[in-house]
Amino acid sequence: MENQIFELQYALDTFYFLVMGALVMWMAAGFSMLEAGLVRTKNTAEILTKNIGLFAIACTMYMIYGYDLMYGGGALLSGISGQGETYSNASDFYFQVVFVATSMSIVSGAVAERMKLFSFFAFAVIFTTIIYPLEGSWTWGGASVFGLYSLSDFGFYDFAGSGIVHMAGASAALAGVLLLGPRKGKYDEAGNSKPILGANLPLATLGTFILWMGWFGFNGGSVLAMASKESADAVAMVFVNTNAAAAGGVIAALLFAKIWFGKADLTMALNGALAGLVAITAGPDTPSALVATLIGAVGGILVVLSIVWFDRKLRIDDPVGAISVHGVVGLWGLLAVPLTNSDVTFSAQIVGALTIFVWVFVASGLVWYALKSIIGIRVSAEEEDDGVDLTECGLEAYPEFVSK
């Protein structure tokens, strides 16, 4: 009887992992639609090619080496197949690999409209094989940071990846954007920012809702169990808090944009939703629903401030606001954890955040610089004018009407 109960719990937890992983996988569609809606028509097919390509690269490279680097267990499939203690090892791998793809997807939008496609893919290989798995091994994997110190000894806590996944992706994106430079025509001779409008806001809105839905798998799956009353209650609370934070982010971003700009900016509302989701990801397990709403609301305000600051003050061109959503708000998410979790300290979160940022930013910067020196990372001015759909992919997403 006891063995039958164990087998039932094992099957339920494995199935739960797979379903949550499938929800996270669907976030790839969300990123694709969001980015396709926020770039110009002449660059749509290329951004979609980036997204499906990076997902395939992440799945392959993490299987070959990244998963072993992050968690150990032997190279290739030896560390993936077989029975775990409470669920299948393969279900754990599947859940983890879609997180890797999510982190890499963040980079795609930030470098949109002017990066060479295969230079991006080359970076994706290194990021998903080494850069992300190594920082993941220091956090969720429990390894020491180059043998110097252990984040677990400090008490660093990141429930589902505000820092480990989102801030890491934003750090890699920032390094790339700094070397890549802004899009042609983004800033005038005086350095003033000129708006470059996205082509399809309905598509961007659809992408945001897909991401919102997928986030329930992202955070809910990170409870790591479902087959007991306690774990089922925990998953339900994480779902509620995730939803509440996203709602808080939308409301705060909309109100703040209305006060600041005099208009209810849809793109800020969309980024507000994502900011709320990123903010709660580090600690959706401890706050009440109301506190989760407030954490998301702070994220919604921060993302509006950050997007404007990066664009107008720092002149860092991020077409979709990815660095602000996932980087700045990812940091806020880490720092918000001690507000509701008394076992976590601000100092631990700061050490963890600095470790993630410094490693990913420096390592990514070196890879981007090497790619720039060897094969180049930016398309020519003429290719940028024509649109990377034609120059990189040889086709157009909207062949009957393309506005250049």
Regions found by a protein language model. Name each.
Residues 1-404:
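Hydrophobic alpha-helical transmembrane bundles of multi-pass membrane proteins
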